[in-house]
Amino acid sequence: DEIHFADGGVYRHAIGYGHFMETLLEAFPNEKDALSAYCSLLAKVGSLISPEVLRSGRFSAGGFDYMSMSAYDEIAKLTSDERLLNVLAGGLFQNAGHSRKTSLYEYAMVNHSNIEGAHSFVGDTQHVADAFVDVIKSNGGDVFTGSEVTALSVAGDRLETVTVNGKDEIIADNVISTIHPAATVSLLDNNSIIRKSYINRIKTLENSLGAFTAYLLLKPGVLRRSACNFYLYDTPSVWSAYDDSGNGEIHTMLMCHQNNGKSEYADVVALLIPMSYSHVSKWADTRTGRRGEEYEGFKAATAEKMLSFAGGFF
């Protein structure tokens, strides 16, 4: 990854802890101890999601301690260099992190995976979804598309049935929901398990930000594909770059060149900015392709702002 600041500063997050540290030492030669401690901390927390731990099917007990720690506070203990502190937060876009909100566990899991993993997929990510489906089916499972869970029926102290599309019922020993907690509890029928006070609290919690994405389709041979992702910031304070002002201003952006595996040139560039749901909530009850001229105008205007923002860095 490359972290770009409006003052011209460019810093790199390399793959592999050794390379990661060596690369940042070129920009911060006096921060060797801080970077060493940082890498050790990330690797320690990241070990909690090792394949061995995941195969056990249990959450590592040590992870709970890191969930109650502030990522910003713990990293700030390692260095007094403000620019380094913000460079280490360069990839916060992936979880819209913030100095007041992001836990060390959340931060470390994302950044450890980035350092130890690949920077992009060859082609699109559909083959990852296909691989998941293959694993599920090879273990006797089924995957249903075009299906919406419309009710979760409670009997006594357990969830008894899951209703799909308002008619089909599924009975299971365990049910896992990965949609918004407030949306999950709204599906409960005859709820006698979860207290009303908890449900009310879940519904009033501040939501995290989503991402607005603009895809640029390029003419062949125009732009050489870069082997990295670009994080662009017009503010020196990355840790607060994701405050939603509500005025539509852009302060940070993620830019990616899709690796099609066929050419050294990019055919698609993706531009992503963080966005609060409040900006699009007026179209909540509409369907794709039927949201009207106002929505199309909103998309076009936002895309133009994004192009202008990105153009200021290259």
Cite the ranges covered by each PLM segment:
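Rossmann-like flavin
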Residues: 6-102
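Surface-exposed helix-capping loop/turn segments at secondary-structure junctions
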Residues: 51-56, 137-143, 224, 311-314
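Glycine- and acidic
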Residues: 90, 112-120, 211, 284-295
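Residues forming anionic-ligand binding surfaces in small-molecule and nucleic-acid pockets
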Residues: 102-113, 274-276, 283-285
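Helical element adjacent to the flavin cofactor pocket in flavoenzyme catalytic cores
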Residues: 107-165, 170
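Mid-domain catalytic core of redox enzymes
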Residues: 150-264
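C-terminal segments that line or cap access tunnels to active or ligand-binding sites in enzymes
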Residues: 220-314
